[in-house]
Amino acid sequence: MHEPRLWVKRLVIWEKPGEQPLRDVPLRPGLNIVWTPDDNGIGHGGGKTLFCRLLRYCLGEDKFAPEDQRDGIGSAFPNGWVGMEVVLDGTCWAVLRPLGIRRRHFAVPNGNLDELILSEMPTTGLSPLLNSIEDNLLTPGVRDLIAGKKQGH
């Protein structure tokens, strides 16, 4: 069985660097079912939507939640971080983004997420990962379409 070209291996949430993660969710190639025990019978409040939004945030989306929720999470976790290990063509990238006050963003090939959260390395931004995804996965037609949107067409 071949591994997918792009897949998320792990999502981690820290209240602050140096502490044990609040959540460390391992994933595997293929279908992963995200569920929570349904104590009230309605399935709300388990964090499934936020989990998906955090994945998108680590893959380059600007915001991980609507403004009121971001403000609440930022107030509760002013030093909070979310990290993701994403595998692209066999290379595991470590991605780290802030949850609280504005800080640095990182995307490091062959990086170790547990070491990256503690490091003082210079900011990389997400461009290294996003450029690698664009260069390695997207067809020329899709790349041209994205370039047109970036230029305002």
Stretch-by-stretch model annotation:
Residues M1-R97, H105:
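Extreme N-terminal "head/tail" segments of very large remodeling/mechanoenzyme assemblies
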Residues I101-H153:
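Glycine-rich phosphate-binding loops of NTPases
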